[in-house]
């Protein structure tokens, strides 16, 4: 089951290793869940519904650490977890290379919080009861809250172990964007102040450090304290997908929260 990571244009698999042809990833399966959610929303096709449910089952049953509920980045064809490597043509591949693959006990805070809100959206579109999925969503949000949020400088880190401080403390634009949506969703679902405080923390960091207000786009990569590392606003792997979506979805959820407290 599941999907391979990298293909050529003729749909033949790329080689393995850094070319990605021998791996399955959380990233691809999460975004296929997102794609099938929208496809099913538009068509109401039973086949699209079935595919969406399959994606949810793969993510929750094969691609998370037990008992933490956090995402595992990469797998072989049989869904055996692998130490994550950086593929040759993905976001961040033009940074200085790392000597080794990431530890197996490593998880990405941005992907976790993003998976939580995309899962909630998928369940809404399927019109299923959210209750059975709440523990999974809460584990993702709680782990990002405990280990991913930088309570000193603001923002959310890149990644770290399941138990312990972050090991990659830079601030990437897309993780900030997904955390805004994810923590607001958690605040709406669980009605806990802690999630609102996480949202405020990340929003303040984004507003004061990451946005180029002159043109409205976000900077790509900052150091932990907000010092600019990459000042470009566009890139092969940096488009307005995360930032525009986060702005729209944040406004939508803030309106929902406002209605709840009236």
State where each predicted segment sits:
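Glycan-recognition and catalytic cores of secretory/periplasmic carbohydrate-active enzymes
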Residues: 1-262
């Amino acid at each position: 089951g599941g999907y391979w990571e990298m293909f050529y244009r003729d749909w033949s698999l790329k080689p393995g290793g850094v070319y990605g042809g021998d791996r399955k990833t959380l990233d691809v399966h999460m975004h296929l869940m997102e794609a099938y959610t929208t496809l099913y929303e538009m068509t109401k096709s039973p086949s699209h519904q079935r595919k969406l449910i399959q994606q949810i089952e793969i993510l929750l049953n094969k691609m998370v650490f037990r008992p933490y509920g956090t995402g595992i980045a990469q797998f072989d064809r049989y869904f055996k977890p692998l130490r994550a490597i950086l593929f040759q043509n993905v976001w961040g591949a033009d940074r200085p290379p790392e000597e080794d693959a990431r530890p197996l006990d490593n998880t990405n805070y941005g992907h976790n919080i993003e998976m939580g809100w995309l899962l909630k959206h998928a369940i809404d579109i399927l019109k299923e009861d959210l209750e059975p999925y709440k523990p999974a969503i809460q584990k993702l949000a709680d782990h990002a809250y405990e280990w991913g949020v930088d309570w000193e400088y603001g923002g959310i880190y890149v990644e770290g172990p399941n138990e312990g401080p972050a090991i990659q403390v830079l601030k990437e634009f897309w993780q900030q964007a997904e955390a805004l949506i994810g923590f607001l969703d958690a605040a709406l679902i669980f009605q806990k102040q802690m999630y609102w405080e996480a949202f405020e923390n990340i929003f303040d960091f984004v507003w004061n450090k990451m946005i180029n207000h002159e043109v409205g786009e976000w900077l790509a990569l900052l150091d932990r304290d907000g010092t600019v590392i990459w000042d470009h606003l566009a890139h092969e792997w940096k488009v307005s997908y995360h930032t525009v979506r986060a702005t729209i979805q944040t406004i939508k959820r803030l309106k929902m929260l406002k209605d709840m407290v009236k």
